[in-house]
Regions:
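Long, positively charged amphipathic alpha-helical accessory segments at protein N-termini or as interdomain linkers
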Residues: 46-64, 74-213
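N-terminal lobe of the biotin/lipoate ligase/transferase fold
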Residues: 1-58, 78-80, 88, 196, ...
Length: 213
């Protein structure tokens, strides 16, 4: 595990910059060696999301929610992002290691204009204590397997039952989020009634705006 006090070139999903000012957030990277399939990356990301939420609930009176697949929100504001990348073996085709990046705003007071809908945890807890709690919960979850946390993940989802849109290969599609499968995939019902499961890390899920009459 590597922890930084600041990131000068923090990176989020799809190459976006991750704002990481000195001394105000948690910037940690965990490397997990396991030899899993690439599609299991989504389950590792969901495990990290649960670890962050459990740590927040353990150390504060906040009530976090998870926006599939990699963001943690409090009061509809993003306070944490998670990025998982794989190191793939050339011969095996397996993910020999998963690199889990966790960035959480602890006491960040100001955000640049391009950082939308962000907020800080703003709780009376040290970064060191929060990092230790996240790491403890993450190792416990990874040791115990999917069954130990998937119900928790579902109960903390901020999307289930809501109308959403997802973007895949540049195409925006309306759907309804109806479930989380056993390894963390988002199950959605399309407008034609068909049901699919989203797994790709390049999918962006946004609550669909509804017009007021």
């Amino acid at each position: 595990m590597v922890v930084a006090d600041e990131q000068t070139a923090g990176r989020g999903r799809q190459g976006k910059q991750f704002y990481s000012p000195r001394g105000t957030g948690i910037y940690m990277t965990v490397v997990v060696h396991h030899g899993r399939r690439l599609q299991d990356a989504v389950s590792v990301t969901t495990a990290a999301g649960v670890a962050v939420c459990r740590a927040i609930e353990e150390l504060t009176d906040k009530h976090p929610q998870i926006k599939w697949v990699n963001d943690v929100y409090i009061d509809d504001k993003k306070i944490c992002g998670i990025l998982t990348e794989a190191v793939v073996g050339m011969e095996s085709g397996l993910a020999e290691a998963m690199i889990i990046g966790i960035g959480a705003n602890m006491q960040t007071e100001e955000f640049p204009p391009e950082v939308e809908n962000a907020a800080s945890l703003d709780a009376d807890v040290s970064r060191a204590d929060m990092i230790a709690a996240i790491a403890d919960h993450l190792w416990e979850i990874l040791d115990d397997g999917y069954e130990s946390y998937i119900d928790y993940y579902r109960s903390h989802s901020m999307l289930l039952g809501k109308a959403i849109t997802f973007i895949r290969d540049g195409v925006t599609t309306p759907a309804t989020a109806i479930g989380i499968d056993e390894i963390g995939g988002l199950v959605v019902r399309l407008e034609d009634g068909s049901v699919i499961t989203l797994r790709s890390g390049e999918i962006t899920v946004r609550p669909r705006c509804t017009k007021k009459s």
